Amino acid sequence: MLEKFSKWKGNRSNHTTPSHSLDESAIPKHVAIIMDGNGRWAKKKGLPRIAGHREGMKVINKIVRKAIDLKIEVLSLYAFSTENWKRPRTEVDYLLKLPERFLKLELPNLMEENVQVRIMGGLDTLPEHTAKAVTKAMEETKDNTGLILNFALNYGSRYEMVEAMKQVAKEVETGTLSSDAITEDVISRHLMTADLRDPDLLIRTSGEIRLSNFMLWQLAYSEFWFTDVLWPDFTEHHLTEAIAVYQKRARRYGGV
Protein backbone atom coordinates (compact mmCIF):
# COMPACT_ATOMS: atom_id res chain seq x y z
CA MET A 1 0.00 0.00 0.00
CA LEU A 2 2.81 2.43 0.90
CA GLU A 3 4.55 1.62 -2.38
CA LYS A 4 1.37 2.33 -4.35
CA PHE A 5 0.78 5.56 -2.41
CA SER A 6 4.28 6.67 -3.39
CA LYS A 7 3.53 5.92 -7.03
CA TRP A 8 0.31 7.94 -6.83
CA LYS A 9 2.21 10.89 -5.38
CA GLY A 10 4.82 10.53 -8.08
CA ASN A 11 2.15 10.92 -10.72
CA ARG A 12 0.68 14.07 -9.25
CA SER A 13 0.95 17.22 -11.29
CA ASN A 14 0.82 20.85 -10.20
CA HIS A 15 1.41 22.67 -13.45
CA THR A 16 0.21 22.80 -17.01
CA THR A 17 2.32 20.65 -19.30
CA PRO A 18 2.83 20.75 -23.05
CA SER A 19 0.62 18.59 -25.23
CA HIS A 20 1.53 14.92 -24.99
CA SER A 21 1.66 12.51 -27.89
CA LEU A 22 -1.01 9.90 -27.24
CA ASP A 23 -1.48 6.42 -28.61
CA GLU A 24 -4.92 6.70 -30.21
CA SER A 25 -5.40 2.95 -29.92
CA ALA A 26 -5.00 3.06 -26.13
CA ILE A 27 -7.29 5.91 -25.13
CA PRO A 28 -9.20 5.00 -21.94
CA LYS A 29 -12.78 4.25 -22.86
CA HIS A 30 -14.23 5.47 -19.55
CA VAL A 31 -12.71 8.40 -17.67
CA ALA A 32 -14.11 9.43 -14.28
CA ILE A 33 -13.25 12.76 -12.67
CA ILE A 34 -13.66 14.01 -9.11
CA MET A 35 -13.89 17.74 -9.81
CA ASP A 36 -12.43 19.16 -6.60
CA GLY A 37 -11.06 22.51 -5.51
CA ASN A 38 -13.66 25.08 -6.59
CA GLY A 39 -13.96 26.55 -3.10
CA ARG A 40 -10.21 26.73 -2.54
CA TRP A 41 -9.75 28.35 -5.95
CA ALA A 42 -12.23 31.07 -4.99
CA LYS A 43 -10.69 31.56 -1.55
CA LYS A 44 -7.22 32.06 -3.07
CA LYS A 45 -8.66 34.85 -5.19
CA GLY A 46 -10.66 36.43 -2.37
CA LEU A 47 -13.97 35.46 -3.97
CA PRO A 48 -17.05 33.72 -2.56
CA ARG A 49 -17.12 29.93 -2.93
CA ILE A 50 -19.90 30.10 -5.50
CA ALA A 51 -17.54 31.98 -7.82
CA GLY A 52 -15.36 28.88 -7.87
CA HIS A 53 -18.32 26.67 -8.73
CA ARG A 54 -19.30 29.03 -11.54
CA GLU A 55 -15.77 28.91 -12.96
CA GLY A 56 -15.67 25.15 -12.56
CA MET A 57 -18.78 24.81 -14.71
CA LYS A 58 -16.93 26.50 -17.57
CA VAL A 59 -14.17 23.90 -17.34
CA ILE A 60 -16.69 21.11 -17.90
CA ASN A 61 -17.40 22.52 -21.38
CA LYS A 62 -13.72 22.34 -22.34
CA ILE A 63 -13.18 18.86 -20.95
CA VAL A 64 -16.30 17.47 -22.64
CA ARG A 65 -15.10 18.80 -25.99
CA LYS A 66 -11.63 17.35 -25.45
CA ALA A 67 -13.15 14.00 -24.49
CA ILE A 68 -15.10 14.04 -27.74
CA ASP A 69 -11.94 14.85 -29.71
CA LEU A 70 -10.11 11.97 -28.02
CA LYS A 71 -13.01 9.60 -28.72
CA ILE A 72 -13.49 8.75 -25.06
CA GLU A 73 -16.69 6.72 -24.80
CA VAL A 74 -17.83 7.62 -21.27
CA LEU A 75 -16.99 10.66 -19.13
CA SER A 76 -18.27 10.43 -15.55
CA LEU A 77 -18.17 13.64 -13.51
CA TYR A 78 -18.72 13.81 -9.74
CA ALA A 79 -20.94 16.88 -9.55
CA PHE A 80 -22.76 16.66 -6.20
CA SER A 81 -22.39 14.00 -3.52
CA THR A 82 -24.88 12.86 -0.91
CA GLU A 83 -22.49 14.39 1.64
CA ASN A 84 -22.59 17.82 -0.05
CA TRP A 85 -25.98 18.49 1.56
CA LYS A 86 -24.00 19.29 4.73
CA ARG A 87 -22.59 22.44 3.15
CA PRO A 88 -24.08 25.92 3.82
CA ARG A 89 -27.60 26.26 2.42
CA THR A 90 -26.68 29.11 0.08
CA GLU A 91 -23.89 27.03 -1.45
CA VAL A 92 -26.10 23.95 -1.81
CA ASP A 93 -28.82 26.00 -3.49
CA TYR A 94 -26.29 27.42 -5.94
CA LEU A 95 -24.73 24.03 -6.67
CA LEU A 96 -28.14 22.56 -7.49
CA LYS A 97 -28.88 25.37 -9.92
CA LEU A 98 -25.71 24.69 -11.90
CA PRO A 99 -26.94 21.55 -13.72
CA GLU A 100 -29.97 23.49 -14.94
CA ARG A 101 -27.82 26.41 -16.11
CA PHE A 102 -25.24 24.17 -17.73
CA LEU A 103 -27.82 22.13 -19.63
CA LYS A 104 -29.81 25.18 -20.69
CA LEU A 105 -26.68 26.64 -22.25
CA GLU A 106 -25.08 23.47 -23.56
CA LEU A 107 -27.90 21.11 -24.50
CA PRO A 108 -28.06 22.34 -28.13
CA ASN A 109 -24.29 21.83 -28.45
CA LEU A 110 -24.46 18.42 -26.81
CA MET A 111 -27.17 17.41 -29.26
CA GLU A 112 -25.06 18.64 -32.16
CA GLU A 113 -22.08 16.66 -30.87
CA ASN A 114 -24.22 13.50 -30.49
CA VAL A 115 -23.60 13.40 -26.71
CA GLN A 116 -25.87 11.32 -24.51
CA VAL A 117 -26.50 12.81 -21.05
CA ARG A 118 -26.98 10.48 -18.11
CA ILE A 119 -27.45 11.06 -14.41
CA MET A 120 -26.62 8.63 -11.63
CA GLY A 121 -27.88 9.51 -8.18
CA GLY A 122 -31.08 10.20 -6.30
CA LEU A 123 -33.21 12.43 -8.51
CA ASP A 124 -36.23 12.06 -6.25
CA THR A 125 -34.70 14.22 -3.50
CA LEU A 126 -33.39 16.97 -5.78
CA PRO A 127 -35.20 20.31 -6.14
CA GLU A 128 -37.92 20.09 -8.76
CA HIS A 129 -36.20 22.56 -11.10
CA THR A 130 -32.99 20.50 -11.04
CA ALA A 131 -34.73 17.17 -11.54
CA LYS A 132 -36.81 18.53 -14.43
CA ALA A 133 -33.75 19.98 -16.18
CA VAL A 134 -31.70 16.79 -16.01
CA THR A 135 -34.66 14.58 -16.90
CA LYS A 136 -35.31 16.73 -19.97
CA ALA A 137 -31.64 16.45 -21.01
CA MET A 138 -31.65 12.67 -20.59
CA GLU A 139 -34.84 12.32 -22.59
CA GLU A 140 -33.70 14.57 -25.44
CA THR A 141 -30.29 12.90 -25.77
CA LYS A 142 -31.24 9.26 -25.08
CA ASP A 143 -30.87 8.23 -28.73
CA ASN A 144 -27.49 9.91 -29.22
CA THR A 145 -24.66 7.48 -29.87
CA GLY A 146 -21.54 9.53 -29.14
CA LEU A 147 -19.89 10.35 -25.83
CA ILE A 148 -21.89 9.34 -22.75
CA LEU A 149 -21.69 12.29 -20.34
CA ASN A 150 -22.52 10.74 -16.99
CA PHE A 151 -23.09 13.17 -14.12
CA ALA A 152 -23.00 11.82 -10.56
CA LEU A 153 -25.59 14.06 -8.95
CA ASN A 154 -26.80 13.50 -5.39
CA TYR A 155 -24.68 10.36 -5.57
CA GLY A 156 -22.95 8.29 -2.91
CA SER A 157 -21.32 4.96 -3.65
CA ARG A 158 -22.15 3.34 -0.31
CA TYR A 159 -25.82 4.25 -0.77
CA GLU A 160 -25.66 2.86 -4.30
CA MET A 161 -24.28 -0.46 -3.06
CA VAL A 162 -26.81 -0.71 -0.23
CA GLU A 163 -29.67 -0.14 -2.68
CA ALA A 164 -28.19 -2.73 -5.05
CA MET A 165 -28.01 -5.29 -2.26
CA LYS A 166 -31.61 -4.56 -1.28
CA GLN A 167 -32.67 -5.35 -4.84
CA VAL A 168 -30.64 -8.55 -4.84
CA ALA A 169 -32.09 -9.58 -1.45
CA LYS A 170 -35.61 -8.96 -2.73
CA GLU A 171 -34.97 -11.18 -5.75
CA VAL A 172 -33.68 -13.94 -3.47
CA GLU A 173 -36.71 -13.53 -1.20
CA THR A 174 -39.15 -13.80 -4.11
CA GLY A 175 -37.32 -16.78 -5.56
CA THR A 176 -36.26 -15.12 -8.82
CA LEU A 177 -32.61 -15.41 -7.78
CA SER A 178 -30.79 -18.11 -5.85
CA SER A 179 -28.35 -16.98 -3.17
CA ASP A 180 -25.80 -19.34 -4.74
CA ALA A 181 -26.17 -17.43 -8.00
CA ILE A 182 -25.08 -14.08 -6.53
CA THR A 183 -21.86 -13.06 -8.27
CA GLU A 184 -19.92 -9.88 -8.88
CA ASP A 185 -21.69 -9.56 -12.22
CA VAL A 186 -25.09 -9.83 -10.53
CA ILE A 187 -24.22 -7.01 -8.13
CA SER A 188 -22.77 -4.90 -10.96
CA ARG A 189 -26.03 -5.25 -12.88
CA HIS A 190 -27.90 -3.71 -9.95
CA LEU A 191 -25.67 -0.63 -9.70
CA MET A 192 -26.47 2.73 -11.29
CA THR A 193 -23.77 2.04 -13.87
CA ALA A 194 -25.28 -1.32 -14.86
CA ASP A 195 -24.83 -0.86 -18.62
CA LEU A 196 -21.56 1.08 -18.46
CA ARG A 197 -18.05 -0.35 -18.39
CA ASP A 198 -16.03 0.37 -15.25
CA PRO A 199 -13.78 3.45 -15.41
CA ASP A 200 -10.35 2.84 -16.88
CA LEU A 201 -8.95 6.05 -15.42
CA LEU A 202 -9.89 8.15 -12.39
CA ILE A 203 -8.69 11.74 -12.18
CA ARG A 204 -8.97 13.83 -9.02
CA THR A 205 -8.02 17.48 -8.87
CA SER A 206 -6.97 19.70 -5.92
CA GLY A 207 -4.26 17.47 -4.44
CA GLU A 208 -6.56 15.33 -2.32
CA ILE A 209 -5.78 11.61 -2.46
CA ARG A 210 -9.03 9.85 -1.65
CA LEU A 211 -12.16 8.58 -3.40
CA SER A 212 -14.76 10.46 -1.33
CA ASN A 213 -17.45 7.79 -1.70
CA PHE A 214 -17.27 7.84 -5.50
CA MET A 215 -17.78 4.65 -7.54
CA LEU A 216 -16.09 2.46 -4.93
CA TRP A 217 -17.16 -0.80 -6.58
CA GLN A 218 -16.49 0.33 -10.14
CA LEU A 219 -13.00 1.74 -9.44
CA ALA A 220 -11.58 -1.57 -8.16
CA TYR A 221 -9.15 -1.93 -11.09
CA SER A 222 -9.04 1.62 -12.43
CA GLU A 223 -5.83 3.59 -12.78
CA PHE A 224 -5.68 6.70 -10.56
CA TRP A 225 -4.14 10.07 -11.41
CA PHE A 226 -4.07 12.88 -8.87
CA THR A 227 -3.12 16.49 -9.54
CA ASP A 228 -2.62 19.50 -7.28
CA VAL A 229 -4.35 21.65 -9.89
CA LEU A 230 -7.68 23.02 -8.68
CA TRP A 231 -10.64 22.18 -10.89
CA PRO A 232 -11.21 25.74 -12.23
CA ASP A 233 -7.58 25.69 -13.45
CA PHE A 234 -7.83 22.22 -15.01
CA THR A 235 -7.28 22.27 -18.77
CA GLU A 236 -7.33 20.01 -21.79
CA HIS A 237 -3.55 19.66 -21.35
CA HIS A 238 -4.03 18.17 -17.89
CA LEU A 239 -6.48 15.64 -19.28
CA THR A 240 -3.98 14.72 -21.98
CA GLU A 241 -1.22 14.45 -19.38
CA ALA A 242 -3.33 12.10 -17.27
CA ILE A 243 -4.02 9.88 -20.27
CA ALA A 244 -0.34 9.89 -21.24
CA VAL A 245 0.55 8.62 -17.76
CA TYR A 246 -2.26 6.06 -17.98
CA GLN A 247 -0.87 4.74 -21.26
CA LYS A 248 2.52 4.07 -19.65
CA ARG A 249 1.03 1.81 -17.00
CA ALA A 250 0.54 -1.95 -17.24
CA ARG A 251 -2.95 -2.94 -16.14
CA ARG A 252 -2.66 -6.44 -14.67
CA TYR A 253 -6.04 -6.77 -12.94
CA GLY A 254 -4.44 -8.70 -10.10
CA GLY A 255 -2.35 -10.90 -12.41
CA VAL A 256 1.36 -10.88 -13.21
UniProtKB/Swiss-Prot annotation:
Classification via Pfam families: Prenyltransf
Binding site for substrate: 37-41, 49, 53, 81-83, 85, 87, 204, 210-212
Domain of life: Bacteria
GO molecular function, one term: manganese ion binding
GO BP terms in the entry: polyprenol biosynthetic process
EC number annotated for this UniProt entry: 2.5.1.-
Cofactor(s) needed for function: Mg(2+)
Keywords: Magnesium, Metal-binding, Transferase
Cofactor binding annotation: Binds 2 magnesium ions per subunit.
Binding site for Mg(2+): D36, E223
Record GO cellular component, one term: cytosol
Assembly with partners or alone: Homodimer.
Protein name: Isoprenyl transferase
The species this protein was found in: Halalkalibacterium halodurans (strain ATCC BAA-125 / DSM 18197 / FERM 7344 / JCM 9153 / C-125)
